[in-house]
Amino acid sequence: MDGATLAPAKVNLFLHVGPVDGDGYHPLASLVAFADLGDRLSVEPGEALALRVTGPFAAGLADEADNLVLRALRALGDVTGTGPPPLRVTLDKHLPLAAGLGGGSADAGAALRLARRALDLDLDDAALTQIAAGIGADGPMCLFARP
């Protein structure tokens, strides 16, 4: 099975970054909303995990072999014990890189959702959320585009 989905842009309406705490991280307080625009991802069966990047902002990612989409899908393979999923992923990149719109995390979340469906994996939302959390601080909220 194959599929496609939107990876919506995350808009920070409010963001407060606190001082570094004991574990070396900054506590965050934020209020976000998700837009009706973003990147588009599609997956189809393949012989091995592969990523093709297209779109107006593809140039910044075209040579990046370890972007968040690939990291998320490799982590999914680790959790399932099957290794990297044999999927051909196309990322149609419409969000500018490093613009604070959560594009990479949204792309990773969309890839996880699509892979679960395409591979008919018996993983619940909590398991996907754990994988997304390992990708980045905004991974869980970008997974399902929910603040």
Question: Where in this protein do the model-derived segments appear?
Answer:
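ATP-binding N-lobe of GHMP and related small-molecule kinases
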Residues: M1-A99, R117, L121, A126
